[in-house]
Amino acid sequence: MDTLQAILLGIVQGITEFLPVSSSGHLQIAKELLGVELEENLTFDVALHAATVLSTIVVLWSEVWRLLKGLFSRRFNAEQAYVLKLVLSMIPIGVIGFLFKDRINAMLDAPYILVIVSAMLLLTATLLAFAYYAKPRQKETISYRDAFIIGLAQACAAMPGLSRSGTTIATGLLLGNKKAAVAQFSFLMVLAPILGETLLEAASGDLTAGIATGTLAAGFAASFVTGCLACKFMIEIVKRGKLIWFSLYCALAGLVSILSYFC
């Protein structure tokens, strides 16, 4: 992988991590088109995800800081309750990561990966369409039950091609939660799992294996900058209820991808 390829992939990751169009699916398609070696996948993916975590913290810093301050209060408060809901939502993806991480990574190397990605993009399109046309009641706050269900949706999105943000946001909306609250919760709930994965890879000594540090840094920077822009954009899109356009895009991308595989 050269520096230009790293920058292009960083841009793809930064944009698609927050848009409900599957960052893993688009990243896999981009790698296939750019001819990036598959053995570089895990190392580079971890770096790009770490960049988007940082962009999330930057964009939502006021909320992150409010939660951190409230977390250390002696009295149980709304901030501590919110953090507990975030922790609850992270349990399913933690279990999936612990039990099936190797199988999921092996799936990325499979010759039929584009078929899987295509199918998951079509599923993402379906979920977003359901969320757009459903008219549930608007709950003031996300409940513990809803937090866990949204967490289950995030665990399902471990499948390549199934959009994490699309799945969690659609699930939250179908459960009757307010758009702005769901968007914020969706972006905050992924921070700890991705940070945890990044730290585990760093501890194993594999974080820079197989790819030059400068190339890795270029991809990280590109992903961070575009991630900041995409995060702000997506929050506004969810507030305005414009998810149907992403449903149409995912359907088109899934169909084109699967046709390109068989034709």
Where are these regions (language model features)?
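Multi-pass membrane proteins that catalyze or facilitate reactions on polyprenyl-/lipid-phosphate substrates
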Residues: M1-C263
